[in-house]
Every structure is written in structure tokens, then in C-alpha cells.
């Protein structure tokens, strides 16, 4: 078995974000660290985010930080990864890629505690940076320029300190003095010696004990630029809970030094400066016995002002400012700012935005409505209690509608699936194409997300029409690219026998003064020349000038016009009988007839190419009769309407043609452009001339062909010779394909209308074709208005629809259904198709907990706050308004209930309406961990079984009781009725239906239960499994069981003996997270370290187990070292780079092959595609081997070592690496493709086909 790995959905979790001017312009950009990839984000003035570049690094990115050289104009990126190397990246805006500027090796590969890469700190002036490990090692590199002004890096300078654990690191702003770096660390030398010198467990032992015994230190490391060495300049003790150190602007911009964040306090520290301490305010309802801890931070600096924005573990944002004079700080001011969802990282941008990379859920870009200066300075002090704690009432906590944000306003979101807890591919709403159902998030951010392949759209307006239109067009106010007003003025809708003209403004109204003939069917409306309009109808055409003067041309004789096409200077019409007449605009902006040509066959389609840059006329026209072929004709005067190339369609009827220019960064176009500009020519292949010709037109010309059978063909049209090459085919639907040109992100795009609506557009330099989540359309046109600069107007039956496309670049659009608590599992009712979700929350506030007993001090302060508000506002004590203001916070901000406190729900949901039919809450303290439906015996009635635990404590693990709850579906499956509970000894994490009974994993035992009158009856059991059972699959008489620590076990059930026998297991111990049966002998599994593997039972063993004539073979077989008597064969292995949470065997294409679909905790969705031919295996294996040597990973990690992180990669080809082929320069593409005996275009075509035909 050979598999091909492809990523469908990129990782959506963001572990770190940085901002800077990476492209060298003044535009602020954001770089996101997704753990295994980097992404560059830009946003417009409206705060809408757009992904500019996404790149896999084929390694684990541990940290990133930006820096700018002194007097530089652009920012660079320093990356710390698992490669044992430090890498400096530069964003190349011309090629839209990250270029590796420097790569320095300093240690071993892997995420090790003593290998630097976990922490990065940069001197604020860009002169040096420090890279540090969790323990011991710290290296300093000096940054400089060479004689050519290129960035250079020095040899590393060591700043190691043994037996030291680092918690945080930053650069200290000292102006242009010797660079200084600050760290928060703790020395565990005494702890290490007291434990006997054991190096392996010293950190863990120290963390488990009271850290107060060991003093945390703030240490300054100075880089002496003269002596070229690093010394520890200063060290002082800080709070034991200190966890973050932040740089304070220095020199002429501030006092310098650092801020240290610890539990309950923000402290200003600097050498030769007294400590200045400020208490962090607390929210109402928080536990007074637990301090406030800062988890993320950012800062903003501008001329004459700077401030810090930090976030607590509750989601509260605090603004920190300093009162200082010179280099002396007198006070640290910490004021409540706003409350948002918990963020892994905060990034304050220079132009008034805040990016919050959420820990779980969507990431948000906020606009600063204000920076909190108008907050009363004495507000916090006025709420100070006798212990010195400061209290405040939070706003908009975690997305609840308590009170709107005061200082921030969300402007844009990046969708995130992280973490994916459970995942299934189903077609519950009968849409033909399956939907992807995902349980995501935790706590208040929990949701069920329904993913559909395609881009989401926003419908702006919909209106009914008097009939079914035959076409729709828009007319701009001005065709000049320099025009101030680029909006459209008319929407023209054609019906049978009539035409309607609509004016575009604040409202859309009918217009009768446009000069357009309204008493006929319109075939084409197009802007031409100096704001003129051409209208083509069956009997002729009208040329309407900007001053409404009309020139009309009539078709000769009894002939009628059947097809027409035009650009801004040319018009071609096709008459009945097969005659083509070609017109051009003269210098007086009048249309003059140039030539006629009779093709002697009825014309089905005609299309004129766009006008290239630097020319006045287009050079080619494409025409076709109904059965093809498609002919490309020249429009040059010396060979006007002469054939230059041809495309065969195998006599399939043609529906539409379109020629469009797109800026495609593929097949080494940039290299060929540079060669063309220097006069070099290359004629190796047809694709070479195609790439070089794009220089003339500013982009690549593509001919799209829509066929009657629902297939679209795409060919590259050479803008010099007119030759067609690189032909690609895609099935879009069941109906004929109509093609319409639109604008997306200011660039040309193509809308293909079939049984689904598809969009062809350029995404990060590549041509993507994705469906739109909208009803089938029949006609479409681009529309620009004051309300929406880029929208589309279309018709569907007798309706007109105006819509815009959201979130370009996404592969799936999402529909979110909010949940009450953290989801655990969901299943589908086999008869009603209802979705059954099990939600379980630990440390949860249950309704019977008395808040006054838990947090009397917080409640007292609430009442005091209420009295103060009443006195200030002159409101009586019995006024209900003030009570309404305070009461919701008492309910929302109750303290955590503590360990062993759980709340669980069983929710039944309609998959079509998303209505919650039942939300059954389990008893207080009862936690549900597993769920399945089961039909006992031959009755056919479906029951629901839930594995529950009461008062469970996770660490150390303990529980009061465990049981199986059996529920009956009532009211047509919409409600649940509890029948009884069955006590078990250990928690049940996995269960399944098995031959009319229930099989479940009770601790490390496998049990089979049957239904009884008062409880489930134990029928069979085996205790021969090592630890805890987390997965169970049944097929025939076999059970495939996943152990939490010991991989996969095959179990045989002997019905005659009513016995279970473990007869095969894995050789390697694996910490299982998910598994799926591929066939009777094969299983795919995943572990928590990111490995996906395939195991197979040897055929000989499988036959022996099934054909045991004595019936006693399994009974007397025994393995060695407590293992099974037989071992599974290791078929395939692959390291994904992230913890895999689910595996599914499914088909994503109707009638397509089955694939293994996997999801990760970071929100990524990937697929393993089985190969069906040896030829494909050889092709992709050779391609992968060449890509490993010619496309080195961005962060210096060896690709083969990365994919073999824990086990050697076997029989799985990395499709993500193979798809990097299109980013290589042309010479590398050519050398690799020659080894494959193909051209570069054929290699890219092969890569596209395996994704489109077998996945989406």
C-alpha cells in the first residue's frame, strides 16, 4: 500500500504573531506562526484581512521575531525552529515568497530543552539578537551589513549558564550603547544536587515542589561590541510567580528598563533604579485567594507616547503606562481596558489596530476606537478594598452580550477550527456533496461547525423579475483606468423580446434614457472607446456615444446575429449561416467594418481576447461551431481571420468561450521574464514560449471552454504566436458550463456556471477553481457600486441576485452552531439522522453552588459597587435598572467550582434546521466521556448508551463511581428517556455495537453487555489488555482495540465459547488518539505525537485465525513478555507535525475513491490518498526525491528526518512537498521534469489532477 499525503485545510491555530513592514513598503503586515507553517497577512483601511502568502516550512516553528537594521526600510524575520539552526527570512514581494537570507547551525535537531530556539530577543536598534533554550544555552549573534549593504551575521557568542531554566526573554532598549538582553530564570543547582544529580528528572521535580524555595532572577546580559563577548551585567531577585519580561522604550523615547509581570503585580525594574510596583485590578466574581496572571502582551510606541497592552488568564485587557521623568519612573499605571477572548498572542499595529490570535476560536482584528485616556484615573482606586485589591466590572467577556466593548471594535476575523475534537464526513442534508461536521473549541467558545467545500457569499439584495432573463451586463460610468469614479451606472437585463435598463445608485431603478433599445432581445452590452456603449441584438447593433448620439448598424439581408463579442476597441459578430464580421474603432471612435469571413458552419461561440498592455488592439479571436473544434484566428491586418491554432473538443457540444488575462506565478514565469528582458530566448518546450510571452501582456492569456457535458477546458494561449498549450480539464457539474468574467481583489477572474457556481481566480500566484456556496445561477456580471466596490449581479430563474464573495482563499465555508460546554463526541442516529452531541465541562460552575459561600468578598464588593452607582446616579435602592446592570455579572463571572466538579449535556440536533431538539443535562458532578447507539438483539429498537463518571479528578486520577447510562429515544427520536444505570469499575472511554450487543472498554478490560430489565448484563470479558482502551471497532467476529499507550490489538470473538482472545498486537508502543478500519485485516491509527500509521494482519495469520479446525488454537497460544502471540505488519508511517485527533475513511467526491481523512488539534484537515497504479507511485516517488534535494525546507530542517520524527517514513509520499514544484524557478523545474520524462506543465497538471479528481 502506497499513500499520498495532502493538506486540505491549513492549520488555523496561531501560536505567535508579529507585525512589521516586511515587503519594504509602508504597509503594516502580520506574520503568523501556525506551528508548522508561516503565513503573511495584510489588511486594508477597513480592517479586512487577506492572506498574501502561506508556506510550509517542513519543520516545527518554535518562535519568530521581527527586526530592522539601523536606518533600514524593511523588516526581516528571525525564526527559531526544531532544525538546530537559526534562520533569517526576507519577504520577496516580486516572487511572493520568503527568501532565506542566512542559516546558522548551532545545535542538534528536535525540540530539546537545551537546544536554543524556544526564545528569541532582538536589540531594539537591530544590532544583535539572542536565541535561547529552555535550559542552559543562550547564544548572541551580531547583525551587520557588508560593503554591498547586504545583511550579515556573526559567529555565535555564548551566554550559557548551567542548571538554569529560562521563563522569558527580551531585548533592553539602551539606545546605541552596548546591547543588553534581559531574562527571567531560576537556578536549580541545589535541587539537582539534592536529588542525587539525576539530570533527567530535575526540571519536573523542581516544578512539582514549591518554587518559592528557589529564587527567580531578572538578569541582564550585555554584549560588548568592542570586546566581542557577552557578560552577565546585573541580576536581581523578582517575584516567584514572575513569568513575562517586557521591553520599555529607552534612549530619547522613554526611561528604558523592563516591566516584569507576575501574579497580581506589574513591576518596573532597571539597573540602579528602585523597584516600582503596581497591583493588577481584578474583575468582580474572581476568586480573591487566586491572583491575576498575565498570559500575553504587546506594546505600542509612537513619538512622544508609548503604552503596553496585556491580557490576563480571564481575557481581561489592561493598559499599562508609566509616569517618568528622564530615566526615573515614579509610577506604573495599570487600568482595565476591555475584555476579549483568551489570546495566545497580542499584536498592536502601528495604524490603530489590534490583532488577537485566540487560543481557541476565531482570530480577530480590532480597531482602537480609543486608547482609554478618557478613563477616570481614580476609578480603580475608588474600588480598592481593605487588602489593597482593585476591582472592576468587565465588558463583553468572551463574546457574551453583557456590555459592548468600549475601546475596541472588531473589524475582521480569521476562521479557526482549532481544536478539532471530533470530526465526521456525512451528507445529512442530501446535497450530493458531503458536508464535514467538526466539534471545535472549549468552554464558551465551543461549537459544531458544518464545513462545505466552497467560498461563502454575502447576499446584498434579491428581487423578482417579470420573466426569465437571457443575459445580464453592467456598464461602468467611465472606462478610463484613471477615472475617479470606477462604479457602474447601468445594469442591463435581457429577456425574450425585451430589454430592461436599471440605474445603479443609492437604489436600483429602471431607466429609459440610456439610449439602449428596449424592444428587442439583447445579445451583448459592452463599454467601448470613450465611455461609449455597444448594444448587439439579433437584427444589428447600436453604438451609443457618451452624449447619447446613436449609430446603428443593420444585419444584411435576412440574416440575424447569433453571437457577438467585444473589447474596448474591437467587435466581432457571427451571423446565421456561419459568417463572421469584424469591426474596429477608428480614430474618430466610430466602428468600421474590417473584414468578413464565411466559415460555412453555424457559429456556437465567439470570443475576442483582451487588449494587451501597450497595444491598441487585441491580436486573436476564438470561434467554434457546435461540435468544435475551437479555432484561434488572427486579427492582424496581414492575416486577418486566418487560423493560427486549434483545440479539439472530441465533438462535445460547446456552450461558451472566454479568453482572460491572469497574472499567474507558475512554471518559472519570473525567470522567463528576466530572460526576456535581457534578450535571452529559450525554445525548449511550448510552455517556455508561453511563459515568456506573458511579459508582453503583463500576464498569461488563458482560453476557457465550457462544454455541454459540464466539463470546462483551460488552455494557455500564447500572446505572440496564438498557439494553445498546457490543456487542463475539470468536471464542474451536470449542466452546460457558461463562462463570465468578473473582478476579484482588483484582478481578473472567471465565473463558471453549471449545476454549481465555480470561481477561477488567482490566489497567492496560483490559479484556483473553487465552488461558491450559492444557488445555481444562469447569467452573471461584475458590479461595482458605492455600497460594494466588488460584487456580482446574477440571475437565477426569474430572480436577480447581487452578492459579494467573502474570505477568498478559504477552501471551506463554515456554518457555526454554538454549544453549551466543551464537546467530547458526536454520533448520528442511524434512522432519523439526528446529530447527538455529548458535551462535558470540567471545573464547571453548577447551578446549585452558592456563590456567597465560595466568594463572599467578591459578592460584598458587588453590593458596594451597586450602592456607589446608586448614590452617584441619584437612583433609589429599589430601582430595577441598576439591579439589571449588576445582576448578570454575578451569574457570568462566578469563580471556578474546583476539581471534580463537572457538568455534561446530551444534545439532539436537527441537521437541516440546526434546531436543538433536546438538551439533557446529566446530574451534577457527572461527566460523560463516550457515547454510541446500540440495537440489542433482533428488536431493531435503537438505544443510546453513554459512559459516565462521577466526581472525577484528573490529576491524580480518581473518581467516585463509573456507570453506563442507557437511554430510550422517544417522540420520534427527538427526546431521551433514562432507563437505568449500570455500575462499572473504571471509566468507559470507548464503546461500540457488536452483533446485537454492546462492547465497551472498562479500564483495560473488554466487556460485552446485553440488555437486561434493570441493568446491562455482562456476557463476556477479557482483561488481557495493558492499560486503558480508547478506541473500539468491530467487523465480523473481530474487534480492533486501541490502547492509550500500547497501540492496536486484534481480538477474536468465539461465539461457540463466548470467549474473547487477543491474538495480534503492534510491535511499537504508541499513544493512541484515533483509529479506523480500512478492511478486515488493515487498520490505520494515529498517536498524540503526530504519527499516522497503517498496520496489517499477515494474510497467513488471518487465515489461521478464521479457519481453526480444532477450535483450540487461540486458547492455547501465548505470546512473550505479556504480548499477543502474533504481530501486525507495519505497512506505512508518516509524521504529520501535529497531534492527530480523528481519522475517517470516506469519499469526498461523488463516485470518487475512498481516502483516509485526518484532522489535527491545530485545526488542519488532511488526506491520505491510496495509489491505484505502480506508474503513479514511481512518478511521485521520483518527484519527492528530487524535491527533497532541490527545494530545501525554509527553516533548515531535513525533510526526510522531519517526516521520520519518531518512526522512519514508509510508503507515504509527501504531496505538500511535491506541490512546491510550481514555486521553483524554471531551470529547476526543467531538470526535475526531464528526469520524469515530462514537461514542467505536465508535472503541474498531474499534481492538480490528483487533488481535484480524488479530493475536492
Curated annotation (Swiss-Prot):
Signal found in the keyword field: no
Domain of life, per lineage: Eukaryota
Region: Disordered, residue numbers: 671-696
Regions of compositional bias (Low complexity) in chain numbering: 674-696
Primary localization: nucleus
GO cellular component: nucleus; spliceosomal complex; U2 snRNP; U2-type precatalytic spliceosome
Assembly notes: Identified in the spliceosome A complex; remains associated with the spliceosome throughout the splicing process. Component of the spliceosome B complex. Identified in the spliceosome C complex. Identified in the spliceosome E complex. Component of the U11/U12 snRNPs that are part of the U12-type spliceosome. Component of splicing factor SF3B complex which is composed of at least eight subunits. SF3B associates with the splicing factor SF3A and a 12S RNA unit to form the U2 small nuclear ribonucleoproteins complex (U2 snRNP).
Cross-referenced PANTHER family: DNA REPAIR/RNA PROCESSING CPSF FAMILY (PTHR10644)
Protein name: Probable splicing factor 3B subunit 3
Gene: sf3b3
Amino acid at each position: 500500500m502506497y499513500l499520498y499525503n495532502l493538506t486540505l485545510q491549513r492549520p488555523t491555530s496561531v501560536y505567535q504573531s508579529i507585525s512589521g513592514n516586511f515587503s519594504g513598503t509602508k504597509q503594516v503586515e502580520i506574520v503568523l506562526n501556525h506551528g508548522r507553517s508561516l503565513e503573511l497577512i495584510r489588511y486594508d483601511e477597513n480592517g479586512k484581512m487577506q492572506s498574501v502568502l502561506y508556506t510550509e516550512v517542513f519543520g516545527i516553528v518554535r518562535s519568530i521575531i521581527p527586526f530592522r537594521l539601523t536606518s533600514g526600510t524593511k523588516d526581516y524575520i528571525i525564526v527559531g525552529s526544531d532544525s538546530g539552526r537559526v534562520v533569517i527570512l526576507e519577504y520577496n514581494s516580486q516572487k511572493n515568497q520568503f527568501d532565506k537570507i542566512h542559516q546558522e547551525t548551532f545545535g542538534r535537531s528536535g525540540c530539546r530543552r537545551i537546544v536554543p530556539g524556544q526564545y528569541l530577543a532582538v536589540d531594539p536598534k537591530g544590532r544583535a539578537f539572542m536565541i535561547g533554550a529552555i535550559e542552559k544555552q543562550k547564544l548572541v549573534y551580531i547583525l551587520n551589513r557588508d560593503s554591498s549593504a547586504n545583511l550579515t551575521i556573526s559567529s555565535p557568542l555564548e551566554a550559557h549558564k548551567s542548571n538554569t531554566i529560562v521563563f522569558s526573554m527580551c531585548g533592553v532598549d539602551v539606545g546605541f550603547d552596548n546591547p543588553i538582553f534581559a531574562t527571567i530564570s531560576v537556578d536549580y543547582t541545589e535541587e539537582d544536587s539534592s536529588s542525587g544529580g539525576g539530570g533527567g528528572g530535575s526540571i519536573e521535580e523542581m516544578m512539582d515542589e514549591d518554587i518559592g524555595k528557589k529564587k527567580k532572577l531578572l538578569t541582564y546580559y550585555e554584549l560588548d561590541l568592542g570586546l566581542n563577548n557577552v557578560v552577565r551585567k546585573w541580576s536581581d531577585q523578582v517575584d516567584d510567580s514572575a513569568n513575562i519580561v517586557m521591553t520599555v522604550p529607552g534612549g530619547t523615547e522613554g526611561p528604558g528598563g523592563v516591566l516584569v509581570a507576575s501574579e497580581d503585580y506589574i513591576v518596573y525594574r532597571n539597573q540602579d533604579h528602585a523597584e516600582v510596583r503596581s497591583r493588577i485590578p481584578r474583575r468582580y466574581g474572581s476568586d480573591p485567594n487566586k491572583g491575576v496572571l498575565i498570559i500575553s502582551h504587546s506594546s505600542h510606541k509612537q513619538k512622544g507616547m508609548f503604552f503596553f497592552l496585556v491580557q490576563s488568564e480571564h481575557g481581561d485587557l489592561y493598559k499599562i503606562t508609566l509616569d517618568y521623568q528622564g530615566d526615573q519612573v515614579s509610577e506604573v499605571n495599570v487600568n482595565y481596558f476591555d475584555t476579549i477572548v483568551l489570546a495566545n498572542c497580542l499584536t498592536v499595529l502601528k495604524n490603530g489596530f489590534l490583532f488577537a490570535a485566540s487560543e481557541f476560536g476565531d482570530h480577530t482584528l480590532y480597531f482602537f476606537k480609543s486608547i482609554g485616556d478618557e478613563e477616570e484615573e481614580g476609578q480603580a482606586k475608588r474600588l480598592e478594598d481593605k487588602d489593597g485589591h482593585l476591582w472592576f466590572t468587565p465588558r463583553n467577556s468572551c463574546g457574551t452580550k453583557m456590555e459592548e466593548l468600549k475601546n475596541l471594535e472588531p473589524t475582521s476575523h480569521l476562521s479557526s477550527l482549532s481544536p478539532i475534537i471530533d470530526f465526521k464526513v456525512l451528507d445529512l442534508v442530501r446535497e450530493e456533496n458531503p458536508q464535514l461536521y467538526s466539534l471545535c473549541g472549549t468552554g464558551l467558545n465551543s461549537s459544531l461547525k458544518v464545513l462545505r467545500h466552497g467560498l461563502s457569499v454575502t447576499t446584498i439584495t434579491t428581487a423578482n423579475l417579470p420573466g426569465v432573463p437571457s443575459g445580464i451586463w453592467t456598464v461602468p460610468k467611465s472606462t478610463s483606468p484613471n477615472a475617479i469614479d470606477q462604479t457602474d451606472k447601468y445594469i442591463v437585463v435581457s429577456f425574450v423580446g425585451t430589454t430592461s435598463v436599471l440605474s445603479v445608485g443609492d437604489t436600483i431603478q429602471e431607466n429609459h434614457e440610456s439610449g439602449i433599445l428596449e424592444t428587442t432581445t439583447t445579445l451583448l452590452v459592452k463599454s467601448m472607446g470613450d465611455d461609449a456603449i455597444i448594444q448587439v441584438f439579433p437584427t444589428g447593433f447600436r453604438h451609443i456615444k457618451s452624449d447619447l448620439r446613436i449609430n446603428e448598424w443593420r444585419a444584411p439581408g435576412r440574416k440575424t446575429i447569433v453571437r457577438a463579442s467585444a473589447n474596448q476597441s474591437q467587435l466581432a459578430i457571427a451571423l446565421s449561416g456561419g459568417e463572421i464580421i469584424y469591426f474596429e474603432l477608428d480614430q474618430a471612435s466610430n466602428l468600421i467594418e474590417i473584414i468578413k469571413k464565411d466559415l460555412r458552419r453555424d457559429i456556437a461561440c465567439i470570443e475576442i481576447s483582451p487588449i494587451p498592455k501597450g497595444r491598441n488592439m487585441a491580436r486573436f479571436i476564438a470561434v467554434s461551431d457546435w461540435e468544435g473544434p475551437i479555432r484561434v484566428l488572427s486579427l492582424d491586418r496581414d492575416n486577418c481571420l486566418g487560423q493560427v491554432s486549434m483545440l479539439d473538443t472530441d465533438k462535445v457540444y460547446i456552450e461558451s468561450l472566454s479568453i482572460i488575462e491572469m497574472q499567474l506565478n507558475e512554471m518559472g514565469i519570473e525567470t522567463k521574464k528576466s530572460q526576456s528582458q535581457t534578450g535571452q530566448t529559450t525554445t525548449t518546450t511550448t510552455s517556455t514560449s508561453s511563459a515568456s510571452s506573458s511579459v508582453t501582456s503583463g500576464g498569461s492569456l488563458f482560453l476557457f471552454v465550457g462544454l455541454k457535458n459540464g466539463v470546462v477546458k483551460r488552455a494557455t494561449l500564447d500572446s505572440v504566436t496564438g498557439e494553445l498549450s498546457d490543456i487542463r480539464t475539470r468536471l464542474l457539474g451536470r449542466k452546460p458550463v457558461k463562462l463570465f468574467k468578473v473582478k476579484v481583489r482588483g484582478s481578473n477572474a472567471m465565473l463558471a456556471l453549471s449545476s454549481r457556481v465555480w470561481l477561477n481566480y488567482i490566489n497567492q500566484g496560483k490559479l484556483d477553481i473553487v465552488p461558491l456556496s450559492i444557488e445555481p445561477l444562469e447569467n452573471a456580471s461584475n458590479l461595482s457600486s458605492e455600497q460594494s466596490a466588488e460584487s456580482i449581479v446574477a440571475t437565477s430563474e426569474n430572480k436577480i441576485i447581487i452578492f459579494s464573495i467573502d474570505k477568498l482563499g478559504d477552501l471551506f465555508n463554515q456554518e457555526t452552531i454554538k454549544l453549551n460546554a466543551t464537546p467530547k463526541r458526536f454520533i448520528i442516529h442511524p434512522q432519523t439522522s439526528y446529530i447527538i452531541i455529548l458535551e462535558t465541562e470540567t471545573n464547571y460552575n453548577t447551578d446549585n453552588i452558592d456563590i456567597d459561600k465560595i466568594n463572599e468578598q467578591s459578592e460584598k464588593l458587588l453590593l458596594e459597587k451597586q450602592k456607589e452607582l446608586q448614590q452617584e446616579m441619584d437612583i433609589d435602592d429599589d430601582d430595577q435598572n441598576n439591579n439589571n446592570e449588576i445582576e448578570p455579572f454575578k451569574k457570568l463571572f462566578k469563580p471556578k467550582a474546583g476539581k471534580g466538579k463537572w457538568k455534561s449535556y446530551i444534545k439532539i440536533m436537527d441537521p437541516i434546521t440546526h434546531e436543538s431538539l433536546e438538551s439533557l443535562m446529566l446530574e451534577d458532578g457527572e461527566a460523560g466521556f463516550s457515547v454510541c447507539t446500540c440495537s440489542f438483539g433482533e428488536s431493531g429498537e435503537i438505544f443510546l448508551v453513554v459512559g459516565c463518571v462521577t466526581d472525577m479528578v484528573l490529576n491524580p486520577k480518581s473518581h467516585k463511581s463509573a456507570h453506563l447510562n442507557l437511554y430510550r429515544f422517544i417522540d420520534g427520536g427527538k427526546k431521551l428517556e433514562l432507563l437505568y444505570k449500570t455500575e462499572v469499575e473504571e471509566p468507559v472511554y470507548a464503546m461500540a455495537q457488536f452483533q446485537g450487543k454492546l462492547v465497551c472498554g472498562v479500564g483495560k478490560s473488554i466487556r460485552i453487555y446485553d440488555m437486561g430489565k434493570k441493568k446491562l448484563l455482562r456476557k463476556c470479558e477479557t482483561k488481557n489488555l495493558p492499560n486503558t482502551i480508547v478506541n473500539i471497532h468491530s467487523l465480523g467476529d473481530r474487534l480492533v482495540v486501541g490502547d492509550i499507550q500500547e497501540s492496536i490489538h486484534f481480538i477474536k470473538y468465539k461465539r461457540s465459547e463466548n470467549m474473547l482472545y487477543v491474538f495480534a498486537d503492534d510491535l511499537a508502543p504508541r499513544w493512541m488518539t484515533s483509529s479506523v478500519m480500512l478492511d478486515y485485516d488493515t487498520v490505520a491509527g494515529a498517536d498524540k505525537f503526530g504519527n499516522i500509521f497503517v498496520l496489517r494482519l499477515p494474510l497467513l495469520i488471518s487465515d489461521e485465525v478464521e479457519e481453526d479446525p480444532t477450535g483450540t488454537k487461540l486458547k492455547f497460544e501465548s505470546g512473550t513478555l505479556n504480548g499477543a502471540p502474533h504481530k501486525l505488519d507495519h505497512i506505512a508511517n508518516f509524521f504529520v507535525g501535529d497531534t492527530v485527533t480523528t481519522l475517517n475513511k470516506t469519499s469526498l467526491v461523488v463516485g470518487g475513491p475512498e481516502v483516509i481523512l485526518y484532522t489535527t488539534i491545530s485545526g488542519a484537515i488532511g488526506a491520505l490518498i491510496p495509489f491505484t497504479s505502480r506508474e503513479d507511485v514511481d512518478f511521485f516517488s521520483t518527484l519527492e526525491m528530487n524535491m527533497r534535494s532541490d527545494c530545501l525546507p525554509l527553516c533548515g530542517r531535513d525533510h526526510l528526518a522531519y517526516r521520520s520524527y519518531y518512526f522512519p517514513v514508509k510508503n507515504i509520499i509527501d504531496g505538500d512537498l511535491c506541490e512546491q514544484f510550481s514555486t521553483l524557478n524554471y531551470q529547476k523545474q526543467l531538470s526535475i521534469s526531464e528526469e520524469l520524462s515530462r514537461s514542467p506543465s505536465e508535472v503541474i497538471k498531474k499534481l492538480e489532477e490528483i487533488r481535484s479528481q480524488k479530493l475536492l
